[in-house]
């Protein structure tokens, strides 16, 4: 049984708030009753159930009910394309989709049975028994090819839930502000299962992240002031946007915040430092779906700048031939329809462990660039320097013309005017100046500027901001070809 479900059963009479969404408050007793009715509604349902919905109280109830029935649960992020959703439906053999009204078209194209999420609002008492042995299939958006299904059972999830709660000293007094999709495993664990286990409260506000994406960078600060959270999880781009908002407004983050965990992509050291100066207690971590989403995490009592923290207690993390490898209770059972995973997991990430056990991540093993003189460069090294500048939302270093390094730049709303000016040499000089501390051979020799909408349309990045490098290389080649043909 998941620890969160066990805790919910133990608190089924509690009138304390478990989840808040806008003006709706769901107490633990209400949540238990709603989950019980949803479990009854799933009687006779197929063995594999997919969930495609926006963050909401309905999402929470459906998640817990599917889990309680012991079925295989496939949460699907809203940002997946229709082709990806069709692929997942077939790959996981989803027998039933639960969906909200926004995603009717997405589930219809799969041709699979589907049911609109309807949560019973009944005064009739209901209870449920938990069927053990449920499985989650987490589809990673990935940076190449179709999403792969990572299989995680109760043991793997419970390890991560408990380890996260201990790492951040989670208590029933915590107020977790959720701005990322629950379909992302890290957000589901931190925003749903950890608060449930300790008896805390989760506040759902997906509008804030959407507002930031549309250019209103003050939305996170506004949400935090209104909700006074103690814990949040952000991707680096949202942390940078919040910092930019605070700098512009000359404000500080609410004093209620004690932990802002940051993951999903590399976070520039200077951004972490600036966040702290602005009252944002940002702690960078590292993980992957294949390891229950978390491998290492800086914490309030164990933090080191330039690292992603120490590995979670109970994990055996080693560097083998420069690559981070992991063994332990949260390592996946395997990929769907592949051989069961055994032994140590090679992450594909390059890294080191310092003398005090803090993990340092250098970048992806398969993303190393080689210049014309045979020099190896980890692009993440340069990209972190470029994205230190608030004018740059995202940056990717790739091969351009004649084997030279080309930076693909996605400006922020603040940086659009700078990059829109017709002065290529001045802009390139500014980019190279941001990388002043590295050798000349590692600096960008060229750059291409791409708007947020164009980058999204070309699907150049995952939702957490990780670059799809193969697609970006092809995109850059196409841009140069178009320029030649003009």
Language-model features: locations:
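Conserved AMP-binding/adenylation subdomain of ANL enzymes
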Residues: 158-175, 182-231, 236-249
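Conserved C-terminal "lid"/linker of ANL adenylate-forming enzymes
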Residues: 369, 394, 433-486
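Conserved pre-ATP/AMP-binding loop-to-beta segment of ANL
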Residues: 3, 121-139, 146, 169-175
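Gly/Ser/Thr-rich phosphate-binding loop
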Residues: 198, 230-233, 242-303
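Conserved AMP-binding A3 loop
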Residues: 27-28, 135-162
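Conserved ATP/PPi-binding loop(s) of AMP-dependent carboxylate-activating enzymes
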Residues: 307-313, 318-344, 358, 373-377
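Conserved AMP-binding/adenylate-forming core of the ANL superfamily
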Residues: 15-43, 50, 54-56, 64, ...
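AMP-binding/adenylate-forming catalytic core of the ANL superfamily
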Residues: 328, 350-442
């Amino acid at each position: 049984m998941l620890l969160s479900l066990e805790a919910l059963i133990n608190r089924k009479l509690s009138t304390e708030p478990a989840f808040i969404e806008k003006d709706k408050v769901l107490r633990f007793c209400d949540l238990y009753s709603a989950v019980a009715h949803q479990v009854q509604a799933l009687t006779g349902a197929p063995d594999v159930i997919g969930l495609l919905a926006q963050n909401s109280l309905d999402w929470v109830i459906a998640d817990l009910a599917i889990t309680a029935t012991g079925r295989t649960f496939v949460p699907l992020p809203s940002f997946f394309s229709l082709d990806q959703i069709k692929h997942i439906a077939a790959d996981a053999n989803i027998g039933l989709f639960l969906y909200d009204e926004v995603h009717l078209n997405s589930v219809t194209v799969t041709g699979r049975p589907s049911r609109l999420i309807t949560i019973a609002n009944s005064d009739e008492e209901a209870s449920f028994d938990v069927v053990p042995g449920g499985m989650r299939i987490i589809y990673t958006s990935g940076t190449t090819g179709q999403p792969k299904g990572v299989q995680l059972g109760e043991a793997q999830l419970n390890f991560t839930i408990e380890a996260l709660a201990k790492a951040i000293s989670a208590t029933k007094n915590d107020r977790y502000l959720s701005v990322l999709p629950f379909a992302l495993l890290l957000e589901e664990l931190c925003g749903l299962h950890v608060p449930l286990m300790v008896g805390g409260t989760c506040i759902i506000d997906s509008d804030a992240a959407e507002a930031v994406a549309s250019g209103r960078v003050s939305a996170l600060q506004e949400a935090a002031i209104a909700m006074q959270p103690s814990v949040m999880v952000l991707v680096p781009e949202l942390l940078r946007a919040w910092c930019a908002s605070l700098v512009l407004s000359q404000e500080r983050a609410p004093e209620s915040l004690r932990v802002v965990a940051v993951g999903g992509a590399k976070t520039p050291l200077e951004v972490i430092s600036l966040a702290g100066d602005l009252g944002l207690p940002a702690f960078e971590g590292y993980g992957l779906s294949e390891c229950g989403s978390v491998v290492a995490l800086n914490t309030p009592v164990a933090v080191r700048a330039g690292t992603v923290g120490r590995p979670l207690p109970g994990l055996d993390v080693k560097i083998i031939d420069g690559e981070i490898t992991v063994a332990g209770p949260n390592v996946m059972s395997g990929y769907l329809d592949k051989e069961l995973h055994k032994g140590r997991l090679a992450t594909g990430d390059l890294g080191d462990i310092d003398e005090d056990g803090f993990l340092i991540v250098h970048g992806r093993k398969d993303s190393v660039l080689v210049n014309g003189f045979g020099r190896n460069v980890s692009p993440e090294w340069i990209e972190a320097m470029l994205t230190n500048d608030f004018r740059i939302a995202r940056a990717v270093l790739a091969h351009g013309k004649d084997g030279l390094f080309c930076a693909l730049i996605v400006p922020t709303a603040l940086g659009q005017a700078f990059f829109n000016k017709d002065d290529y040499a001045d802009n390139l000089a500014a980019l190279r100046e941001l990388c002043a501390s590295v050798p000349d051979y590692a600096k960008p020799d060229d750059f291409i500027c791409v708007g947020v909408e164009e980058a999204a349309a070309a699907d150049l990045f995952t939702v957490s901001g990780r670059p799809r490098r193969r697609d970006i290389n092809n995109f850059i080649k196409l841009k140069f070809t178009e320029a030649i043909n003009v």
